Amino acid sequence: MENREPAVLVEGLYKAYGDTRALDGLDMTVERGTVHAILGPNGAGKTTLVRTLATLLRVQRGRVEVDGIDVAARPRDVRRRIGLLGQHAALDEELSGRQNLELFGRLHHLGGRRAAARAGELLERFGLADTGKRPVSGYSGGMRRRLDLAASLIVDPAVLFLDEPTTGLDPRGRTEVWESVRSLVGAGTTVLLTTQYLEEADQLADLISVVDGGRVIAEGTADRLKGLVGGDRLDVVVANPGRLAEAAAVLGRLFGGSGAFDLDQLVKFDQSPGEGERPRRISLPVADRRGALARAVRALDAEGIEAEDLAVRRPTLDEVFLRLTGSPAESPADAAGAPAPPAAGVPAAPGTT
């Protein structure tokens, strides 16, 4: 019979370091077989939440269950059902990929034969079978992260916590990890992901929770969150910056009815102009994207205004994040004072239960 209870349930979770509230009555539900992403600015409480769920920090106040088990009452049972991948690879550079996985297996009391068999399964699963005998020191960043991910799965966890899993990787390495995460979820694993890359949440997450001040301030699919900051927008780059205000008035009348837009609100400063150059890009909301480009081109042409580029786009998660939290997502750090996580796949140290 299918288990209908959530993979992770958090109600009223509170955690403080002295006078600093890292988590302040946080509520969250993670459904089984999904990727649930957590976004938040530096110090929002993301890593504190993950460490609490993974039994690395005690529950001060609130209800926390993982795979139906109370984290505060039965932390050892929780550890048997979870995997944790921290922000930094936890691998022995001098050992081979296979030796690393077998080591993690023995640390989890699998025994020699079971550890060797599981290592072989995971190397094959993550496309590392051909390089399993090579020292990890010769692995690329993406290969190391995939091996680290494999290590976190040594006990075949029901729930996997990924804390900034692709920090420091190049685009190719990130893509490799994304593909691995998708395959895990396809096989039934539940993934709770914290990330500083909004594209990562957009690519992977079934549901996204935006955390700020130790609370969930918004939650939904990527499309729903984008809808919170408005609908489609028309971006226009004019060839002559001296006609920017005129272009804004023309497009304002076309899409806004009166043209009574505040130019400062429409101007989007381009990242490409050199120092001292005037802005040439404007962005304004459009109620209906159908035919918007053609209408804009005709209106600008009628006034003799040349546009170098026009595009209709959806809001980005970056804009959602900035609107909701007032700060950009740029730092992988979290609330100060929380202890560092252990190596991937390694049981929590004594004293954390």
Question: Can you annotate each of these PLM segments?
Answer:
Residues E306-R313:
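Conserved short beta-strand edge segments in small beta-sheet-based binding/regulatory domains
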Residues G40, K268-Q271, V312:
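Hydrophobic/anchoring residues in structured secondary elements
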Residues W178-A287:
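ABC transporter nucleotide-binding domain
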Residues E5-V10, K15-D212, A218:
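ABC transporter nucleotide-binding domains
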Residues R295-E306:
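Extended Gly/Ser/Thr-rich low-complexity repeat segments
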Residues F321:
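Residue-level signature of catalytic and energy-coupling elements of molecular machines
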Residues M1-Y14, S327-T353:
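ABC-family P-loop ATPase nucleotide-binding domain
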